[in-house]
Amino acid sequence: MFKEKAKDWDMNEMVKQLTSAISGCIIDNVDLKEKMHVMDFGAGTGLISSKVAPHVNKITAVDISQSMLEQLISKQELKDKVEILCQDITTQPTGDSYDLIMSAMAMHHIKDTDNMVKQFAAHLKPGAKVALADLDKEDGSFHPEGIEGVYHDGFERNEFQTILEKNGFKDINFVTALTVPKEEKLYPVFFVVATKA
């Protein structure tokens, strides 16, 4: 799905809007520090990483799309700040512990949300945070019909909160990052920050 889109991904107007809003939410709602080691899960071409990188020490960009990550490593501003991992962390953990795991619009591509959140907890230091953004529950019209790799039509916030709590997260705070207009419909995107207990 993402191989043919990788080259032009950064030019997509909706992607630009999402990047600006979600990175703004991360910067405004997470106390980013120069010593932080951050995982960008579902990093894609590194748009969110590019915005967060100046505020932290190092970013590990994780994605299963090699073509997306190739676009990421070509970015000059990320050259000395980012390492890339093309792997599925549910079956192949990174072996590191992070101060923050951030993820933008990747969770609806993950079949087992509960297990993914469990893996996030396992990869975080105690007291570290997750900062996640994805679609609020929608009617399935956001993505084209029959598209591969889309397992959820967004999420109910209370159900997502329950998954976070079940996997040891506290201080859970949701905001609306932005509302995406698409083909005469509006799709709210939530942003949630939570702390590993």
Where are the language model's segments positioned?
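Short catalytic micro-motifs in class I SAM-dependent methyltransferases
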Residues: 105-106
